[in-house]
């Protein structure tokens, strides 16, 4: 694609706002909001950290082509849980909790709504390209919007619009105005004074609608994952021929991305690790896991225990009970090693018979 002339980009990203309006209209008819509204609320919970709900909307188009691709990604606490891809023209639920809460029916409705959006998008993208009068090439409209629930109960929202990978507009919640990112012509500024979306509607979505649906999601997620049972803690002990002993504490079936594992010696903390969203590991079934290890002198194992603090749970596991688990793991490893050593012999016999 040829380099641009360097002139300020004259386009109307308000077109993308029309797309978002189709996606984020009131919960009765909305695909995304309808999905969140369908999740049943079984009580509320006290927030222990900041939670986020984020929508990424991207529209791709080749100038001169009627083909337009729409990709909608929805994240909760930075985890992707719903995706619509214009190539497959289907909505895909991500995460076991969705499949357990009518995910298939939800996806069918999502797909039907987003197909209609994609049809409208073709004409909208053509309008943007014509207004820009740029040279041929791939162009992208993108939007990032959503909200945060803070641990103190307050909320804040965000809404950014961009074109070809660069931010163009940002909504300011304090002044309830749209600000143009980067240099812009007076013509562009005047255009937004006339055509920008109504600030009161944007404010309602960021302040009320988005946080309410995020609250519903968090409540449903918590209740759904608690059905899998309480968290579990195991302690293993690995002995080495010479040197120290490694004790490893593992926590499973965690239903949020926050936990604290503490090693205690004779009941007193000696090592503590707090896991947050960026350090805890997903288990692949909608729950999370974490582990922490400590090295001790041989014979000190009975002095140590591991404590998990997770939500309302506090679980203690002693190091002595981990020997059995480690022994069984060693047996399994030995069996695997034996099978592996026998494999070349089996292959040799099979090849000899084949010849």
From Swiss-Prot:
Keyword Lipoprotein attributed: yes
Glycosylation sites: 104, 152, 312
Protein name, entry field: MHC class I-like protein MILL2
Protein task: Binds to heparan sulfate proteoglycans on the surface of fibroblast (NIH-3T3) cells.
Membrane topology value: Lipid-anchor; GPI-anchor
Chain intervals for the UniProt region annotation (Connecting peptide): 324-329
Main location as per UniProt: membrane
Source superkingdom: Eukaryota
Localisation: Cell membrane
Region (Alpha-2): 138-229
Endpoints of the signal sequence: 1-29
Organism per entry: Mus musculus (Mouse)
Removed propeptide positions: 331-355
Tissues in which the UniProt entry reports expression: Ubiquitously expressed in neonatal and adult tissues.
UniProt KW keywords: Cell membrane, Disulfide bond, Glycoprotein, GPI-anchor, Lipoprotein, Membrane, Signal
